[in-house]
Structure formats: C-alpha cells, structure tokens
C-alpha cells in the first residue's frame, strides 16, 4: 500500500490545499493529511476545528478518487510523522520560487534523517498560486470576500470569526 503524507497547518484549508489533496490522492492508496500543531504560529482555528474542516472537505475527494484520506495531527518532526503513519512519500505543494527554496532545504534535511522517504512536489495550478491561508485570514479580517479562495464551509467559519464581508472592502 502506497501511503503519502501531505503536511501543513491548514489554518484554514484553502482551494489551493484541496487541489493538491485531490491530485496527491491519485498518487497513493492512502493519503494522510498531517495537521501541524505549531504553537508559534498562533492559529486562528483550533486543532479540532482544522481537523474537522479537513475531514469534511476531503470526504468528497475520497469518494471521487477512491483513496482513503485521513487527517492526522502531529507535533513532532515531519520525518518522524511520516515514519509514524507509514508514509513512503511526503507531498508538498509549490506556489512560487520562494516555496521551492524553502522546500529544497527541508528535503535535504529530511533525506539526512531518513533517506527512504521521498518528497514529491506538486505545482499549484495557476488559479491557486496566489492563495495563502495567511492572506485569506487577512482578507476576512479586513472585511473582504474570501469566496474565490475557500469552500463555502470554510467561508462560513471565517464569517463566524470576523463577520460578513463589507461591501466597501474592495474599494
């Protein structure tokens, strides 16, 4: 069984994340979404909320692709999480050159820690390259409409936190 690990904070999960999840699920038999517990980032959504959002959003992808997709919180080293879940590959999405530079360094470190686990990069589709969870939260906080960047469920969760979009936010 081919198991892949797609790690991230997913605060919140975006259409870009879901695109990578959908495409990654065609490469493996089981896709583990590693939900990072990163206390330094101070997430907007709790771990439980992020896991619940991912599980809800991934159910349709799993049904579509036939791949088992599970959310798995982790707080240890990424390579240790990969070992814990039996992953033979770590899947990372790339949006820009800056992402590649960071990921290139991480691959080198992970290979030194365990050279049996490969890293696979999937390029973000053009329409998702500018999407970042940090920017989505900022748009929502400032009263903008996040509809182009997240699903309706995630948009509703952001509206619960920040209120509805303001009509003049884009002006």
Swiss-Prot record:
Subcellular location, principal: cytoplasm
Site (Transition state stabilizer): 17
GO biological process: coenzyme A biosynthetic process
Catalytic activity: (R)-4'-phosphopantetheine + ATP + H(+) = 3'-dephospho-CoA + diphosphate
Keyword entries, A-Z: ATP-binding, Coenzyme A biosynthesis, Cytoplasm, Magnesium, Nucleotide-binding, Nucleotidyltransferase, Transferase
One Pfam match: CTP_transf_like
Pathway(s) of this molecule: Cofactor biosynthesis; coenzyme A biosynthesis; CoA from (R)-pantothenate: step 4/5
Residues annotated as binding ATP: 9-10, 17, 93-95, 103, 128-134
One GO cellular component, as annotated: cytoplasm
Enzyme Commission number: 2.7.7.3
Enzyme class: transferase
Residues holding substrate: 9, 41, 78, 92
Annotated compartments: Cytoplasm
Cofactor requirement: Mg(2+)
Record-level Gene Ontology MF annotations: ATP binding; pantetheine-phosphate adenylyltransferase activity
Function: Reversibly transfers an adenylyl group from ATP to 4'-phosphopantetheine, yielding dephospho-CoA (dPCoA) and pyrophosphate.
Oligomeric form and interacting partners: Homohexamer.
HAMAP family with a match to the protein in the record: PPAT_bact
Protein name as annotated: Phosphopantetheine adenylyltransferase
Lineage of producing organism: Bacteria, Pseudomonadati, Pseudomonadota, Alphaproteobacteria, Rhodobacterales
Originating gene: coaD
């Amino acid at each position: 069984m081919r198991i892949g690990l797609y790690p991230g904070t997913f605060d919140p999960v975006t259409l870009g994340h879901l695109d990578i999840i959908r495409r990654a699920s065609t490469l493996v038999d089981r896709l583990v979404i590693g939900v990072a517990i990163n206390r330094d980032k101070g997430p907007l959504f709790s771990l439980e909320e992020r896991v619940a959002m991912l599980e809800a959003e991934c159910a349709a992808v799993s049904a579509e692709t036939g791949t088992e997709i599970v959310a798995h919180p982790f707080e240890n080293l990424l390579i240790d999480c990969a070992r814990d879940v039996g992953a033979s590959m770590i899947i990372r999405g790339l949006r820009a050159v800056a992402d590649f530079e960071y990921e290139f360094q991480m691959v080198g470190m992970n290979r030194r820690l365990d050279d049996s686990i490969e890293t696979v990069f999937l390029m973000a589709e053009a329409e998702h390259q500018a999407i970042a969870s940090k920017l989505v939260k900022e748009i929502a906080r400032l009263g903008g409409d996040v509809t182009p960047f997240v699903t309706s469920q995630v948009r509703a969760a952001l509206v619960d936190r920040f209120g509805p979009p303001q009509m003049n936010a884009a002006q």
